[in-house]
């Protein structure tokens, strides 16, 4: 396995060849794994050499992830969880069937005694996907009108890595985790994907459109980078 070394510490690399890439890409995952993506025209030796030049940056990001205390939800009575910019207080209720519902400022979780957090988690994700779609559609409609495009079909999925994507048929898929974020971030992610309908890249024209649609988008980006890891179910 290839690796880089910085300050006496060896950092293993997971090398992935990609026909779609034009440049070498480095990704540091929250698990600490370092992914090195290589285009066809660059040798692994050249790519590893490039990664070595970025070893300090790689180590800094791995250390940052290691210092983070993992966010764990137990779905216990009195615990809180965000939803579309507000905090919901969890209330546990005994019942025959597992279900989750939002009542006022409460997230009411019903289920038999001994129901595990993983079961309630699935119920909450299902609820957020259903209710979140109702709240996202007006934003999508408004932003689409400002962008001069037809409002896209919207789907919400539970995804590990991507916050969202624009499909080849101009639909948008959003990560259910965005519903745990502040409204500013939610709006930014909608703007980001709708801007991709006309700009299928991250070049200057794309970012110009994002800024036109949402001048304060950089504030949302900073929040996403700093706190996104805490928005988990």
For each feature predicted by the language model, list its residue ranges.
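Walker B beta-strand of ABC/ABC-like P-loop ATPase nucleotide-binding domains
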Residues: 190
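Walker B catalytic acidic pair
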Residues: 193
